[in-house]
Structures are given as structure tokens and as C-alpha cells.
Amino acid sequence: MRGPLFAVVLAVSFLPAPRLAYAQAPDPARQEIARLVERFQKAIIAKDTAGFMQLFLREDITWNVVYTDDSVKRYNASLKDPTIPRATKIQGGSPRRFIESIARSGQARSETISNVRIDTDGEVAQVWFDFAFMVGDYKSAWGKESWQLVRTGDGWKIAAVVWSAEENPQGP
């Protein structure tokens, strides 16, 4: 019995080893999407409304923030005037309103992005990342952000943006 077992073990040892999984070079779609993320960040820093708007499929995309319960409570508690509308947990907007408010601001604005995850089949994609919104050196808010993208004849475009936000409880 020992002889046949040894022969099998010996034969198996000469078989080619299974291919090991190595990190693959990024595919072209992922590289293009990563460049889109960089252009998003650069347009905010440069207060480039036209460049920012070119990143989107159209102006009326889904654009929603979900604030943490604590952020909503703090904001509403800070309001002294009872006629000012109270904040809600989920708020909408648009990419144009966002970039135009940044462009009007006299202060430097930026969005730091980390832990970027891109999932794509080459036609549609999801981008998921951690962000911190900065006003100068002050970390104003942070959370998770998700984009839905589509590949058009003009390249990748953002079709929806949804994010969570924790507002900084400490003022600047």
C-alpha cells in the first residue's frame, strides 16, 4: 500500500501549482473612474463650476445627504429664531447648487477622499469612499459617499450621489 501512495504523492508533486492570485493592474475603466474622482476633488478646490458640472450625466441627478441624528439635533438646537425651518435627516440638492455655493465662498474648500472602492462591469459603476469636507483647515463634516456612474460616449459620468454626514460638533 505504501508504494502506490508514494507514487501518487510523487506524481502530484510534479503537477503544475495552481495559479496564485496576484493584484492585477487596474483595468482601463477603473483608471478612468479614478481620474474622474480626482477631477471632482480638483474642481472643488479650484471652484471650477463648469469643470465640476461636466462630471455629471445631467444637472438633475439624485443628490441626497443623510445626516446623522446627532447632527440634526445639534443644528436644530442651535437655531434661536423659531421661524427658521428646522433641518431634516435627509436633504436633497444638486451638483450645481453645491459647486456654486463653494465658488461663492471666500474660504478655501476641499473634499478629502480615502478608501476608494470601485466596482464596474465597464458600462456601469459604483464608487464608494470615505470623505471629509474641509473649510480651510477645519474638518466641517465627514462620512461615506456613494456614486452611481454610467459610461457614455463622452466617458464616465456621475448619475447619482448619496452620502452620509456627521457635522463637526466643534465649531471652527
Regions found by a protein language model. Give the residues of each.
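Positively charged n-region of N-terminal signal peptides that target proteins for export
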Residues: 1-4
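Short, low-complexity N-terminal intrinsically disordered segments enriched in polar/charged residues
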Residues: 20-59, 172
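Surface-exposed, charged secondary-structure patches
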Residues: 32, 76-139
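Short, solvent-exposed secondary-structure junction/capping segments
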Residues: 41-42, 54-73, 77-80
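Non-catalytic cap/lid and distal C-terminal segments of serine-dependent acyl enzymes
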Residues: 46-47, 61-62, 96-98
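A mature extracytoplasmic/lumenal domain signature
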Residues: 56-59, 67, 129-133, 162-163
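Short beta-strand edge/turn micro-motifs at domain boundaries
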Residues: 126-128, 140-170
